[in-house]
Curated annotation (Swiss-Prot):
Name of the protein: Kappa-casein
Family per record: Belongs to the kappa-casein family.
Site positions for Cleavage: 58-59
GO biological process, one term: lactation
Gene (UniProt): CSN3
Phosphoserine modification, residue list: 102, 119
UniProt keyword terms in alphabetical order: Glycoprotein, Milk protein, Phosphoprotein, Secreted
Keyword Glycoprotein among record annotations: yes
Length: 122
């Protein structure tokens, strides 16, 4: 295993040699329909079989991530909301002007009634 440091990579790669066929060798074994295979692809006696030696090539493998880190447990941060009934007291003011059936001008102040109403808000 060889370490590859490249100015264009943000982190080093470790190269591992592997046997990979060249594209020319791969194309050599593909047979198209309605064609006669080349002599190199036909069955030959075992004494005359040609097996090219595969070239070694290098594959870039990224380094393993640090597995020593402690996993942070997930915590449910969404609290359950329960509805509560909150009684509220509101003051309602009714202003009523009293009109009498007469021709006299009424100069009295209008009557004001204040009632307390209790409602429940959910």
């Amino acid at each position: 295993v060889a370490l590859i440091n490249n100015q264009f990579l943000s982190y080093p790669y470790y190269a591992k040699p592997g046997a990979v066929r060249s594209p020319a060798q791969i194309l050599q074994w593909q047979v198209l329909p309605n064609t006669v295979p080349a002599k190199s692809c036909q069955v030959q006696p075992t004494t005359l079989a040609r097996h090219p030696h595969p070239r070694l090539s290098f594959m870039a493998i990224p380094p393993k991530k640090n597995q020593d880190k402690t996993d942070i447990p997930t915590i449910n941060t969404i609290a359950t909301v329960e509805s509560t009934i909150t009684p509220t007291t509101e003051a309602i003011v009714d202003t009523v002007a009293t009109l009498e059936a007469s021709s006299e001008v009424i100069e009295s102040a209008p009557e004001t009634n204040t009632d307390q109403v209790t409602s429940t808000v959910v």
